[in-house]
């Protein structure tokens, strides 16, 4: 699995305190029911980042099937409760 990073997506997820390493960790470690297809051709994954921190990552697949992360953030308290079930 290859990832494509540029200034835009690295800076965008950094605003939420997520590193490219963590986003990749969440996507690579995805377990059912993730990744989930959401609107258009976007994919959603909930998983654990560095230190077990629960994160949400949204990505698209480029024409050459590289993963391009478009959003990442920590889960909210409500989402964390749902994720633990």
Residue ranges and their predicted role:
Residues 1-85:
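Ribonuclease/tRNase effector modules and their secretory precursors
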């Amino acid at each position: 699995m290859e990832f494509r990073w540029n200034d835009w997506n690295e800076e965008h997820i950094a605003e939420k305190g997520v590193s490219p390493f963590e986003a990749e960790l969440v996507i690579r470690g995805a377990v059912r029911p993730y990744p989930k297809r959401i609107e258009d051709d976007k994919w959603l994954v909930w998983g654990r980042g560095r230190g077990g921190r629960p994160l949400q990552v949204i990505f698209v697949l480029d024409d050459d099937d590289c993963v391009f992360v478009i959003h990442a953030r920590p889960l909210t308290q409500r989402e964390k409760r749902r994720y633990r079930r």
